[in-house]
Amino acid sequence: MLDALEHCGVTHLYVNLGSDHPELIESLAKRAAAGHHPFRVVTCPHENVALTAAQAHAMVSGQPQAVFVHVDVGTQTLGGALHNAFRARVPVFIFAGETPFTLNGELLGSRNRPAQILQDVPDQHSVVRAYVKWSMSVRTGRNIRDLVYRGMQLARSEPCGVVYLSGAREVMSETLDGPAADQAARWPALLPSALRPALAREIAGAVSQARKPVLVTSYFGRRPERVAALVQLAERVGMMVVEESPVYLNFPRSHPLHAGYQAAEVVSDADLILVVDCDVPWINATIRLSESVRIYQIDTDPLKESIPLWHVPAEAFCQVDSALALEQIEAALDHLPNDDPTVAARTRAAATRHVEVEARAKARLQRSAATLNPDSVAACLASLLDDDAIVIDETVTSSMMVLESLPRDKPGTYLASGGSSLGFGGGGSIGARLAAPDRTVVCLTGDGSYLFGVPSAVHIVASRYRAPFLTVIMNNGGWNATKQNLLRLRPDGYAQRDDRLWVGFGQEADLAGIAAAAGGGLALTVREPEQLAPLLRQALEAVRGGRCAVVDVRLPPITLQDP
C-alpha cells in the first residue's frame, strides 16, 4: 500500500493510529531503517485535524494526500471534516483498519484485545458511503496496490473527491514479494472534457449579444493557473464576475469587473448568466430572475448528483472542464472586434458598480473604525499581509466583511472549507503551511469555529511539525449564524424579545491560551481598538519566527444571556 501511495505522488500521511495499524507502523519503520523516507508522517491527536490538514494540503499543492484512522470509531470521528472534503471536491485517500475477523489466533493479526470485539460492526463503510466517490475493503494483500491505484485514479478524476479503503489486520499482515514496479501511470485520471463546438459557438453568441452578461462562480480557481482564462474572457466581453460563497480566489478582487460576493444583487436584471463551478449560485426563494434570462451551467458536476433536491433553470447543463470551456467560448468570439462599443459600455458600467461597492465598504469601515468589528480586523490585516499570504476564512457570518475589507488578488491566496461543517480553519492552516512552507498562513475564524476545530490538537501538531500560522478569532461569544437564522424566521418571536437564544457561551474562556498550553504559541487578546494593529504585528512577527500565534479579538457579544 505504501509503495502504491508513493507511486501516486503522496508525500504526507496524516495519521491517527490504533491497534489496527501495527503492520503500517512496521512497514514505515522498516523503510526508515533502510534510509527510505518518501513520506512525512504527521501524527494527529484528533481525526478532524488529520482530514482538514490533508484537504487543505491538496487544495494548496494540487496533490492528494493520505489519512489513516482507526477502524469504525476513527472513521466516525472524521465527522464534519469528511462532509467538507466531499463538498469541496478535494482528492483525499483515507485508509481505516477493520477489526480482525478471526477469534482464536488462526492467522497473524487475530483478535487479541476486548475492544476489537466491540469494533466488529455490520457495515463500517456505511459511515462514509454518502461522502465518498468510492469505498472498498481489502480482501487480499495480493492486489492492494491495484486498490490504491484505483482509489487514487477516482479521487483525482473530475469531479474530484474522497476515497475510502479499509482492511483487517489479518489481510494487512500478509507477506508479499518484494517491491512492485511503479504502475501508477497505467491508472491516470480522466482527461478533461470540452464543449461541443456548436455549443461553444452558441454560448459565445449569447454572451456577445447580451445586454448584461454575468458569470457566477465559487471554485473555478481551485487550480490557480486557471484564473487567467476567466479574466481573459471577462475582459473580452465586459462580463461581470460574482464570487458566490468563494472556496478559492476565482477572480482578482480589485478588478473592475469583479461584482462582489452576492449574486442576488447582480443577476436579477441579467439577461445571460453563466454559472461556472458553483453549487449554490443563489437561493431560489430570495431572488426573482428575468423571465427571459438565458442560463448555462458549466461544471464538472453540472447536475450536482450528490444533492437530492437541487435546481438551476438552465437551458444547458455542460459537463466539462470549465477552464477549457471558457477558452473555447473566448476562441469562438473571433467575430467580436476588440473595440466593440457594447463591450466598452458593459465594462464602464461594471467599473462604476465596482467603485460604488468599494465606496460602500469603505464607508461602513469608517463608520465603525472606532470599534472592534470584523471590518476593522480584516482591514488591519490587509495592511500587514504580503500578496503571497494564504488567508483561510472560516468567519461564517463575518465572511462578507472579511472578503470586502481583506481583498486578495493573487490566485491561490484564499481558501474556505467548501462545505458547511465548522472546524476547518486550524487543521486546514497546518495543511496549507506544510504544502507551502515558505508562505504566511492566516486563519480567520469565529470563536465557535475555532472550538469546533479542536484547537488543542491543532497546536500540538503545528508545533511538533513546524507549521506556524496566525489565528485571528472574531470572538462574539457564541453562534451568530444560529441567531441570525432565528431572527429571519421568527423576527417577532419570544426568543428575540428577551435575548434568550441558547447560542452564547460567553467570552470568559482564554481561547488564545489553548495555543500557549498545547504548543507554546503566542497568546494575545485584543479588547480595545488601539491594541489591534500592534498585537497583530507582534503575532505575525512570531509566526515569521517559527511560532504559532493566536489573537483573540473580543467583539461585542451576540447575546447577553446568562447561563
Where are the regions that the model predicts?
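Residue-level recognition of alpha-helix initiation/capping sites
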Residues: 76, 119, 198, 224-225, ...
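Short, well-ordered beta-to-alpha junction loops that form the rim of enzyme active sites
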Residues: 166-170, 218-219, 394-398, 553-556
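Phosphate/pyrophosphate-binding active-site segments
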Residues: 142, 292-395, 497-500, 523-563
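Thiamine diphosphate
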Residues: 105-118, 267-269, 310, 319, ...
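N-terminal alpha/beta PP-like core and its mobile active-site loop of ThDP/TPP-dependent enzymes
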Residues: 1-336, 384-387, 459, 468-471
